[in-house]
Amino acid sequence: YSEGVEDETYLRGVQVVGKDGTVTFTSVVPGCYAGRWPHIHFEVFPDIGSITDATNAVLTSQIALSEEMANTVYKDSRYPDSATNMSQVTLETDNVFSDGVDMQMPKVSGSVAKGYTVTIDVPVDTSTEPTAAAAPGGAGGPGGVPGQ
């Protein structure tokens, strides 16, 4: 973590797309907090100079994680509360994904032992005017105890 956020429990990263329009992040499977389906937030900005101000985002969205992958990962003792939280939420009851998740569900391959690869295509028109709206939160909020 960068100076000043060493005690935070959320992950943040910034990437610039390559010439082919793709971006790659290496991360961990996030824990599942109460009331929310396991997910990853992301924002898209029209250019590198815009990334320091969230109101410049041309897209703010979330990626839902697969139930099979999450249930497998949450058997690990480093995710002590995630299995319970996951058992109490469905995609239909989640406050973001309940309106349909087809465009927010990535392809998943891999395993706990070898690691997972999660891929999703997100068409973006960078000429879109920023909407200055943040993604809705959940009952739990960002962070929390690592792995939970």
Residue ranges and their predicted role:
Residues 1-90, 125-137, 141, 145:
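Beta-strand-dominated extracellular/periplasmic modules and repeats
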